[in-house]
Amino acid sequence: MRTPLIDLRGIRKSYGGGDSPLVNVLRGIDLSIHTGEFVAIVGASGSGKSTLMNILGCLDRPTSGEYLFAGENVAALGSDELAWLRREAFGFVFQGYHLIPSGSAQENVEMPAIYAGTPAAERHARAAALLDRLGLASRTGNRPHQLSGGQQQRVSIARALMNGGHIILADEPTGALDSHSGAEVMTLLDELASQGHVVILITHDREVAARAKRVIEISDGLVISDTAQDASDVQRSVNPAALQAVDLRKRLSEGSGSQSAWQGELFDAIRAAWRVMWINRFRTALTLLGIVIGVASVVVMLAVGEGSKRQVMAQMSSFGSNIIYLNGKAPNPRAPKGVITLEEVAALGELPEVKMIMPVNGGQAGVRYGNLDHSSYVGGNDTHFPAIFNWPVVEGSYFSEADEQNAAAVAVIGYKVRQKLFGEQSDPVGQYILIENVPFQVVGVLQEKGATSGDLDSDNRIAIPYSSASIRLFGTQDPEYITIATRDANNVKQAEQSIRNLLQQLHHGKQDYELTNNAAMIQAEARTQNTLSLMLGSIAAISLLVGGIGVMNIMLMTVRERTREIGIRMATGARQSDILRQFLTEAVMLSVVGGLAGIVLALGMGAALLLSKVAVAFTLPAVAGAFACALITGVIFGFMPARKAARLDPVAALTSE
């Protein structure tokens, strides 16, 4: 005696319990089905036949009892193994067709093969052949709404056969069709049965059930009759095609854990995601807006911060990283400020680490030319000024040693002073300006440097001989501060220590001076700018977070709208991981498109800022980081909706509206 392909023993199914009343739908079903049988399960509405079909097709689990498939206890199978059975052993034909609305006939038929990992070329050819066999060769590209009811049901049958369809479970396949289309579908089922497929027909129509070779009647959750038209039909020799079904147990143990389908599934998921986004264009655009604004904000904020940092660093570095500044300071709050004398300046200049040294005697002063007044920093320097600061004269010349010795009333003005007092047209060289009402002749104009940081503008200064500043303007020979250029920019710390040691001797250990160097100032400014950039980026990231919440919201709505599609995919063999991947891919796709659009918008905004003379510097890490954040946002905020979709009950999903 042959082992039954399907063997049900005492199957019971109950719903409710606890706070709700217990409903017993199946009350002890005993049933065996062999390979090659055409069986009709008939019963009135509410008899439990659809529940029985769901259990037979591994869409649902019984409350109690034993279900053996090819000798394997189905209760011991995990969700992935059940999905494998639905994909490889069963093919479902539903009364409502259950086709995915956004997919073509060909794509609907190919779906089980995608989850089976069938190569694209092979599944395309097989789907086309099945549709051709069922008379739909000219309808392969049509969407379900472009097909008649009979054509949609034939697409459903083709889908059931895509992976072999050893067992066809047809739930009221003619219920929604006219008599002609219904007859065509029943003829197809007859042909499949004659070719060796197990056909299990669920119906309430006894005329339809009469087409089967074996009729099982169910009422109130119990089998009340089981008759075969001809005993020889049940025990007939099995078509060779049906022999494949008895090997399913071995194939189940070998193939249920296979992960070979992920590439095809991923491509299908991307294509499906793009189609859904396009169908709901307006809603997608509103969702994307949050991601676009978030990414663009992060990229632009970081670009502005980086541009400002580079501009400030370039301007500070232009003064030289080998510069040390020496100032007098008060050793304590009650003591007077220390003084660095010119004799000490000369002593410091003798140190081997010192290349050049220059005292500066200066301060803020009022400047007038004609009827124009301006406030500028006026510094008394010596002739080392251009060399120490790498600051050439672009008009005229710098004052000479003779001017320094003679305390000549000559001045070299900065670029901003030139702009304020003389504009672009006038030549300032040779003209006289009043500094604190003392006339000075302009002999040169310094090259433009720009602002170093904050409101400090290096170009808003005037250089005059040190002797002139001391005698004509400030009335003191003592310098305001000392500028020291070291010989080696890499050994500034060593030079600073040598200067400190000498000053300790000269000042008898008194700490009434202060040393700072340009390199340290540059590093400190860099840290400040980095902190500012981080703060700007963090503020902008809030909008990206809001965009992520929008993605989660739209994905939750999508899962709700496409619950039936999820059920269809599960019925055709999708595992929970496949559904998770499907909806996670859609969330990531939203983030990818939003991220790319955000980067494009950011580049456009950056170009506009550059035209407005705002320093902007886009960096690959910043752009890539913002895009990566968008992706991570998609994964994080898309995971919960995708997980919810993957955990849906197949039966509940299929019956949802």
From Swiss-Prot:
Role played: Part of the tripartite efflux system PvdRT-OpmQ required for the secretion into the extracellular milieu of the siderophore pyoverdine (PVD), which is involved in iron acquisition. This subunit binds PVD and drives its secretion by hydrolyzing ATP. The system is responsible for export of newly synthesized PVD after the final steps of biosynthesis have taken place in the periplasm.
UniProt-annotated binding residues for ATP: G43, A44, S45, G46, S47, G48, K49, S50
Family: Belongs to the ABC transporter superfamily. Macrolide exporter (TC 3.A.1.122) family.
EC number: 7.6.2.-
Location of this chain's protein in the cell: Cell inner membrane
First-listed, main subcellular location of the protein, grouped into a coarse class: membrane
Pfam family, one: MacB_PCD
Protein topology in the membrane: Multi-pass membrane protein
SMART domains assigned: AAA (SM00382)
InterPro entries in the cross-refs: AAA+_ATPase, ABC3_permease_C, ABC_transporter-like_ATP-bd, ABC_transporter-like_CS, MacB-like_ATP-bd, MacB_PCD, Macrolide_Exporter_MacB, P-loop_NTPase
ABC transporter domain sequence ranges: 6-245
Protein known as: Pyoverdine export ATP-binding/permease protein PvdT
SUPFAM superfamilies in UniProt: P-loop containing nucleoside triphosphate hydrolases
Subunit structure and binding partners: Part of the tripartite efflux system PvdRT-OpmQ, which is composed of an inner membrane component with both ATPase and permease domains, PvdT, a periplasmic membrane fusion protein, PvdR, and an outer membrane component, OpmQ.
Lineage, uppermost ranks: Bacteria, Pseudomonadati, Pseudomonadota, Gammaproteobacteria, Pseudomonadales
Membrane-spanning ranges: 285-305, 539-559, 590-610, 620-640
GO CC annotation, single: plasma membrane
Gene Ontology MF terms in the entry: ATP binding; ATP hydrolysis activity; transmembrane transporter activity
